[in-house]
Amino acid sequence: MGNIHIQTKSKEYDVHVGKEVLSNLTTIVQNMQPAVSNVMIISDEAVASLHLQTVIDALQVEQHVFSFVVPSGEKEKSFENFYAAHTSALENKLDRNSLILALGGGMIGDLAGFVAASFMRGIRFVQVPTTLLAHDSAVGGKVAINHPLGKNMIGAFHQPEAVVYHTPFLQSLPEKEWRSGYAEVIKHALIGDVELYHWLKEEVQTLADLHDEKLIHILTKAIPVKANVVSQDETEKGVRAHLNFGHTLGHALEKELGYGNITHGDGVAVGMLFAIFLSEQVYKVDLAYEDMKQWFLKYGYPKMPRDLNVERLVQLMKQDKKANAGAIHMVLMQEYGVVNVVSISDETVHIALEAFQKDMV
């Protein structure tokens, strides 16, 4: 078991990581001040069928505990479910001393966190992640829902009271979700922990290696990368944008292909490869792009789809939150462990995307 301390300007809290940390949940809730009045667990159908009762049983508290369950899938991070969650909260008499538990992956963490951020102008919540991908989204306080015109466009910054990362919950994940989450692990290694990057190349030959002590090691190394960035820039005014490495194209792919047709991690993996491909041209450096491409393909990450319209992707990349005055801003890599936000012309991105698309045959 390992505890990772997160410190931001607005709040300090711990991430509890391990095989038995669910037992910490009762103490976490009981120690909150002012005392918690009641507890709302927000989850999705897939996770609830596997883990909801386990969490309710582990949560040995006197307060009223109830659940609100939405269908599974990124498209459910919608205004309709956000509104319905508020209705459920009001019907069950949540108040300003209530607590929301986000039980699920990144979609649920974002949705439940935004409900917590907005209900009565903000109440407390705890993240209980059930995916590897959520090692990224559960930490840092960014919560949001999607808009038909863009991912995570309606949201807030709202830090949790704690994150309880009970690793046995991850064992029920399908392979595509392991791969999706592992992409964010790779991202954290590439931008902030070169030693972890080399460890991954040596120790994680297949996704089947992501278990037990190796999994806990990965989580306790990757999460501090994000924690360090968030401590410097809680509200994404500067270096926190570095955590968007691979996301400019990744989000565009998710939007173009349709949420659920490509996982977030698969999109980010393609986006990271493109960022490295473009970085070599912009910085005139050798980042071993070809080796990186083969490494990604070994894990089963997809290639850049050949049938996608490049100009359409360019326009979607201009809708990215880092864009400024209509110009694309991407996180590019100067060297492993050193990244910067760079303004790139539409023409440069278009030419590079066409070349990248052809290279990914």
UniProtKB/Swiss-Prot annotation:
Keywords of the record: Amino-acid biosynthesis, Aromatic amino acid biosynthesis, Cobalt, Cytoplasm, Lyase, Metal-binding, NAD, Nucleotide-binding, Zinc
Residues at which NAD(+) binds: S72, G73, E74, K75, E76, K77, T130, T131, K142, K151
Record GO biological process: amino acid biosynthetic process; aromatic amino acid family biosynthetic process; chorismate biosynthetic process
Catalytic activity, reaction form: 7-phospho-2-dehydro-3-deoxy-D-arabino-heptonate = 3-dehydroquinate + phosphate
Superkingdom classification of source: Bacteria
Entry GO MF terms: 3-dehydroquinate synthase activity; metal ion binding; nucleotide binding
Chief location of this protein within or outside the cell: cytoplasm
Note on how the cofactor is bound: Binds 1 divalent metal cation per subunit. Can use either Co(2+) or Zn(2+).
Subcellular location: Cytoplasm
Entry-linked InterPro entries: Dehydroquinate_synthase, DHQ_synth_AroB, DHQ_synth_fam, DHQS/DOIS_N, DHQS_C
Pathway assigned in UniProt: Metabolic intermediate biosynthesis; chorismate biosynthesis; chorismate from D-erythrose 4-phosphate and phosphoenolpyruvate: step 2/7
Pfam families for the chain: DHQ_synthase (PF01761), DHQS_C (PF24621)
Positions annotated to bind Zn(2+): E184, H247, H264
Any one GO cellular component localisation term in the record: cytoplasm
Broad enzyme group: lyase
Listed EC numbers: 4.2.3.4
Needed co-factor(s): Co(2+); Zn(2+); NAD(+)
Physiological role: Catalyzes the conversion of 3-deoxy-D-arabino-heptulosonate 7-phosphate (DAHP) to dehydroquinate (DHQ).
PANTHER family: 3-DEHYDROQUINATE SYNTHASE, 3-DEHYDROQUINATE SYNTHASE, CHLOROPLASTIC
Family designation: Belongs to the sugar phosphate cyclases superfamily. Dehydroquinate synthase family.
Protein name: 3-dehydroquinate synthase
Provenance organism: Bacillus cereus (strain B4264)
